[in-house]
């Protein structure tokens, strides 16, 4: 293969030889070219088709590990073996490789676009339910709405920009301003989620461990939420400062002047200590608080009453309600930890040069990146599944949409017809109480308006 758009190698050769990774060491004995050296990226960086970036203590480094670039990756020199053609209009350097194939890009679209859609719709619905329903405006639901806003920030800015720039285009097309903002918003969103979960656990801890103490008011909860966002914004502030656009040392990026968005720290030491500090603030400290509070809450809520102590029906209902809320929030905490902890541990391990040369690293990085991005669409599913009031709010909102309301109406009518004709499942029989027949006959008949039934085909009353 001849290189039509050639660069000059340091040795003066008029041809550019580029490593085709994950392919045999190809060489035509009849070719007359100068043997040279080219900087080959380690396997993880091959996702991005970059080659060499400074890795010394004074050079710029990748940094914290935002989702818009592959951070902390090390590189090694390799003999030049394969000569590749490329042009700025048709970038096909790695057409034989999985990462640049059309099938892989289809998989990327199928994995990331549903996250973007479901996260925006689900978290937007959560915010709307809390805002529009008076009885849903509780302290815990205010914190849940704050979580949803953070997930909307992640899904709207970070999810599409990261997968488009990393896996589809292989460069950053969104400009310098969005480079700063996207890296910043990703860190802020994770910090807001961690700190808000801590605030919820402390609120539940106080309410259950000391039930006679004054509860956190809604006004005080808004101040706590504002404080959470302020601390998150301040903690992540170094990230937009060191973020910027840079041309990696690859033939195509250099020739076509294609930039990537990455963090460029003054020294590797600063980057390492900030990454370590951010990991502690995002996960180590919050996870310690969450384990302590929910362990104490679990012991208190699921503990049996002492023998001889009376328990009324009201006490049983309150205990069941507390257990449901604790189960839901524990699920939220576990899902958050499972989604984001692997990706952040991977960013720390990339500081180890030997680990950065691990062959399966590109696949592990891709899987952990998708897992972290997918977190923003899980919380609404948890709320809908484990909380009856959120579930009722979701159902009522669906019935207000014309298309969904008609579909639900046709389905419910079909179910009733099947039940009456005997083709569907039989409805339970209700026994008539003859002793109250005379009294029931004098009462006004129950209203049969569709408005009274939240699952009917007509308009539904708002959730109160």
Curated annotation (Swiss-Prot):
Gene Ontology CC terms: membrane; plasma membrane
Major localisation: membrane
Xref: InterPro entries: GPCR_Rhodpsn (IPR000276), GPCR_Rhodpsn_7TM (IPR017452), NPY_rcpt (IPR000611)
Keywords: Cell membrane, G-protein coupled receptor, Glycoprotein, Membrane, Receptor, Transducer, Transmembrane, Transmembrane helix
SMART domains named among the record's database cross-references: 7TM_GPCR_Srsx (SM01381)
Localization terms from the record: Cell membrane
Topological domain ranges for the Cytoplasmic compartment: 127-148, 211-221, 296-329, 385-464
Membrane topology qualifier: Multi-pass membrane protein
Domain of life: Eukaryota
GO MF annotations in UniProt: neuropeptide receptor activity; neuropeptide Y receptor activity; peptide receptor activity
Chain positions carrying an annotated carbohydrate: 49, 79, 85, 183
Membrane-side (Extracellular) residue stretches: 1-105, 170-189, 243-274, 351-363
Transmembrane segments: 106-126, 149-169, 190-210, 222-242, 275-295, 330-350, 364-384
Gene Ontology BP annotations: G protein-coupled receptor signaling pathway; neuropeptide signaling pathway
Family: Belongs to the G-protein coupled receptor 1 family.
Described purpose of this protein according to its UniProt entry: Receptor for the neuropeptides RYamide-1 and RYamide-2. The activity of this receptor is mediated by G proteins which activate a phosphatidyl-inositol-calcium second messenger system. RYamide signaling may suppress feeding behavior.
Name of the protein in question: RYamide receptor
Species in which this protein is naturally found: Drosophila melanogaster (Fruit fly)
Phylogenetic classification of the source organism: Eukaryota, Metazoa, Ecdysozoa, Arthropoda, Hexapoda
